[in-house]
Amino acid sequence: MKAAVLYGKEDVRVEEVPERALAPGEVRIRIEAALTCGTDLKVFKRGYHAKMIVPPAVFGHELAGEISEVTPGARGWPVGERVVVANSAPCGECFFCRNGQENLCDDLLFLNGAYAESIAVPARLVQKNLLRLKPSTGFRDAALTEPLACVAQGIADCQLRAGQRVLVIGAGPIGLMATVLAVQSGCTVDVLGRGKQRLERSRALGARTTIPNDTPEDFPESLRTLLAANEPWDVVFEAVGKPATWEAGTQLVRKGGLVNLFGGCPAGTKMALDTGRMHYSGLTLKASFHHTPRTIRRALELIESGVVRAADFVDGECPLSRLPELFKSMSAGNRFVKTQVQVDR
C-alpha cells in the first residue's frame, strides 16, 4: 500500500509498504479521510515523538474509514462498517485508569498510520476506542473526533459555568474548537490570535471579540492593550504552546481564576511566573493532556449532532503523494487550519 513514512527530522517519504498481517481481535480500516494536526507537525519538525512514534514509521493519527478486514476475535465488527478510531487506548488496569484518569494511563497504546491507504487497528483499540458512525456522518467530519476529544477533555477540566468570561489564546484548530465548546457551555468568549481569516472564523464560531497578534514581537504590546482595555477573564485557555503565552495566561486571568495550559511546549521548556500574583490572587493552573474513552464518545456526539463540522475547520486538501511538500509548507507557516489528505487510489 502507499503510505507516508517518517524517517527522521523533516524527512517524510511516500512509498510502497507492506500491509501488516492482522493478529486476533484486530481489524483493518480502509482510510477514507485523514487530517493534518499540529502534533504531526511537531513530529515532522522533531523527527520523533517520545510517547507516540519512533521512526521509521507510518505517521498521522486523525482518520476515519471503512472496515475492510476482520479477524475472528473482533466480534461485532463486520466488513463494510463505517468507523472512526482514536489514536490510543488506555490499559484499564493502572492506577490512573482505575481512578478515571485514562488520559494519564501508564501504558497508553498509541496508533499511528493515518497517512496511508489502510491501517491495522490493535485489539485494545478495537475494544475501547473504535466507534460506529451514523449513516449520515461524513468521514471528513468523523476524522475530527480525536482532536475534538482532546479539547473536550480540556474544557471539562476548566469546569466552565454559564456566564463566565473566557479568553482563548490561539486561533488554530484547537483554539477554534475550544471557542465552540466554551460558547456551547454558555460562556462569553474572546480570542487572541494570529491570522485575519482565523480570527474571522473565531467570530463566526461564536467569539464575541478577537484580538489580533500578528507577530511574536507584537505580543508584549498586545498584552498591555488587553490589560488596559479589559477586565481580567474568569478562565484563560492557552492553545499555542509557547512560554510567552503560558505566562500571559497568568497575567490575563482574574483573581481566583483558572488558566488551562493546554498547548504543549517542547520537553525541557521553562517559564517564568510571578509567584506573588500566583499566591495572593489565588490562581489555579491546570494542564490538560490527551483524551479518554468518555471524551472520544462525547466528541463524536458533538460531531453527529452538528455542533462541530469539518466545514468550519478543514480548509485545505492535498493528495497523499504531495504530503512531504505539504508538511514543508506547514512548517513554513501556511495558514490552513486543517488539511484533508486524500489517498491516491
PLM features: residue spans?
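C-terminal hydrophobic helical "lid"/dimerization subdomain
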Residues: 247-251, 293-345
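NAD(P)H dinucleotide-binding glycine-rich loop of Rossmann-like/cofactor-binding domains
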Residues: 91-169
